[in-house]
UniProtKB/Swiss-Prot annotation:
The modification Pyrrolidone carboxylic acid is found at Q45. Its main location: secreted. Residues 1-19 form the signal peptide. This is Conotoxin Ac8.1. Residues 20-44 form a propeptide. Keywords: Disulfide bond, Neurotoxin, Pyrrolidone carboxylic acid, Secreted, Signal, Toxin. Belongs to the conotoxin S superfamily.
């Protein structure tokens, strides 16, 4: 009887652990898609005037300016658009 009860408890614990792992993976996927969605919205606000990487692609320290916005040159990592870029946000 003791062995049977221990087996059932072990089985329940294993099932609960795998469910938690699935929840964590689902949350990671959701966070990643939210992050990329935010990046796309952030990019839409920028009107690029000068080229960030004109002083050398590795330096990523060229001039970056946006009309009526706060901007900086930096490395952007997103699907299909990675590299040095001007990131801007509205001045509030």
């Amino acid at each position: 009887l003791k062995m049977g009860a221990m087996f059932v408890l072990l089985l329940l614990f294993t099932l609960a652990s795998s469910q938690q792992e699935g929840d964590v993976q689902a949350r990671k996927t959701s966070l990643k898609s939210d992050f990329y969605r935010a990046l796309r919205q952030y990019d839409r606000q920028c009107t690029l005037v000068n080229n960030c990487d004109r002083n050398g692609e590795r330096a990523c320290n060229g001039d970056c300016s946006c009309e009526g916005q706060i901007c900086k040159c930096g490395y952007r990592v997103s699907p299909g658009k990675s590299g040095c870029a001007c990131t801007c946000r509205n001045a509030k």
